[in-house]
Amino acid sequence: MNSTNTTDTLSQAEIFKRFAIYGDLVSFKPFGGGHINGTYLSVWNQAGTQVRYTHQRINRRVFQNPAAVIENIRRITEHIAAKLIAEAEPAATIATQPTPQPGTAAVPVSRQVLTLIPAKDGRYFYIDPAGEYWRTYLFIEDAVTYERMESSALARKAGTAIGAFQRQLSDYRGPALHETIPD
């Protein structure tokens, strides 16, 4: 088991194992340069295939009701995934399908929307003994994130992505979303 913080290895590994992830935990490490939540990347051996997951400890100073934040994410991602599946070619609906090769049309739904992984108790979060809330996602391979806007072309792409996200939510008719950061 690899980790950069050996004092937390056992407790973090046990937290990650509280989620409904098939296979054996191979390794994990802190991931990214996030400013709000603590993020970790884990690798699991699933019948000989290495599958990665993102785990986040939610910052309760920023989000005072973490369960509401996660419930909003679940509602939104399920809505978008259902739309993408309804519109997709059959091959695109396979959640663990690898990144399509150049020239192929099908893009897996798991590359277009976050896949929130439930805890083994059925909730979409785990509360550790210290009262910290954790959530887990299937890692989106080959995705790129930016810490800062490096060009106007990148700003346009970000705007296009935000617009596409808003369009995907334009017909959301599910339960009202929770207000997670009050005015």
Please state what every model-predicted region is.
Residues S27-N45, T49-D183:
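Conserved ATP-binding subdomain of kinase catalytic cores across diverse folds
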